[in-house]
């Protein structure tokens, strides 16, 4: 049986450059879905991933659902 509070949770990562830019030429915000272990990484996750809207590798931060 699963515990009431799962250790491994699904999180969303969002590009910080796209979220802060208000340019009209941007078509959206890059988001990735991944999993993290709450016991090993209790703080918010930051990963460097490719953003298809910025066309470069940028920092993606964990966002609330």
UniProtKB/Swiss-Prot annotation:
The keyword Plastid applies. The keyword Chloroplast applies. GO terms for molecular function: structural constituent of ribosome. It is found in: Plastid, Chloroplast. InterPro entries: Ribosomal_bL33, Ribosomal_bL33_CS, Ribosomal_bL33_sf, Ribosomal_zn-bd. One of its GO terms (cellular component) is ribosome. Keywords: Chloroplast, Plastid, Ribonucleoprotein, Ribosomal protein. PROSITE patterns: RIBOSOMAL_L33. Gene3D superfamilies: Ribosomal protein L33. Pfam families: Ribosomal_L33. GO terms for biological process: translation. HAMAP family: Ribosomal_bL33. Belongs to the bacterial ribosomal protein bL33 family. This is Large ribosomal subunit protein bL33c. It comes from Marchantia polymorpha.
């Amino acid at each position: 049986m699963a515990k009431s509070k799962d250790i491994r949770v699904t999180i969303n990562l969002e590009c910080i450059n796209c979220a802060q830019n208000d340019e009209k030429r941007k078509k959206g915000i890059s988001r990735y879905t991944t999993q993290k272990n709450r016991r090993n990484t209790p703080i918010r996750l930051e990963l460097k991933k490719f953003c298809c809207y910025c066309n470069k590798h940028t920092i993606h931060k964990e966002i609330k659902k």
